[in-house]
């Protein structure tokens, strides 16, 4: 089962006393370690539905799913293997009502975000909307809402952006929509 793993990789696979952080460069075998760890946990009696493996990209999730299937067969369908954003969507579909969202909320693409920001800011300039989006994204990734962002603005441009953010958030709530940053930030509030 653990063929092809070096000593450090085997230690990570067999470590069971809590979380295990695997740090390694590209092509070094992280996916192999994680999929073997999944197989080891299932062999040790942990139900597959209690295991989650979260990645950054859809490509990595698909690769991990295929490798897990190769090691554990049909049990792989019960392991949650997805991206951080997909996990956020799943959590928000299940419990988003706590945040005022219906289960069938919409996820905005980049063009939708730009359009709503232009409307919220009263501007027809896409470059201005992209600048607002960049700053709002930064604030959201810091865990700030519009009111909190306004409390820490450094200049008039940020003050305008915080005002646009407040209007943008109002529109998202009215449209029952979220952007990609919300898929990471909102589940943290659940």
Would you name each region that the model predicts?
Residues 10, 30-31, 35, 76, ...:
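Low-complexity, intrinsically disordered short peptide segments enriched in small/polar/basic residues
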Residues 8, 36, 112:
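Short Gly/charged-rich anion-binding patches and loops
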Residues 17-36:
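Walker A/P-loop
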Residues 2-17, 180-183:
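N-terminal pre-P-loop "Q-motif" helix
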Residues 17-20, 39-188:
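A basic/glycine-biased coupling hinge at the interface between accessory DNA-binding modules
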């Amino acid at each position: 089962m653990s063929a092809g793993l070096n000593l450090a990789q085997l230690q990570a696979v067999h470590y069971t006393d809590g979380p295990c952080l695997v740090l390694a460069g590209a092509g070094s075998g992280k996916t192999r370690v994680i999929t073997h760890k999944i197989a080891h946990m299932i062999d040790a009696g942990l139900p597959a539905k209690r295991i989650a493996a979260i990645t950054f990209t859809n490509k990595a999730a698909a690769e991990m799913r295929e490798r897990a299937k190769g090691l554990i067969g049909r049990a792989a369908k019960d392991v949650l293997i997805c991206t951080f954003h997909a996990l956020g969507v799943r959590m928000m579909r299940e419990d988003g009502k706590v945040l005022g969202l219906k289960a069938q909320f919409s996820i905005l693409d980049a063009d939708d975000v730009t359009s709503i920001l232009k409307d919220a800011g009263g501007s027809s300039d896409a470059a201005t909307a992209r600048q607002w989006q960049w700053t709002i994204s930064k604030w959201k990734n810091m865990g700030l809402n519009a009111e909190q962002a306004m409390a820490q603005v450094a200049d008039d441009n940020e003050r305008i952006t915080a005002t646009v953010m407040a209007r943008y958030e109002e529109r998202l709530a009215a449209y029952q929509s979220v952007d990609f940053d919300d898929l990471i930030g909102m589940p943290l509030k659940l």
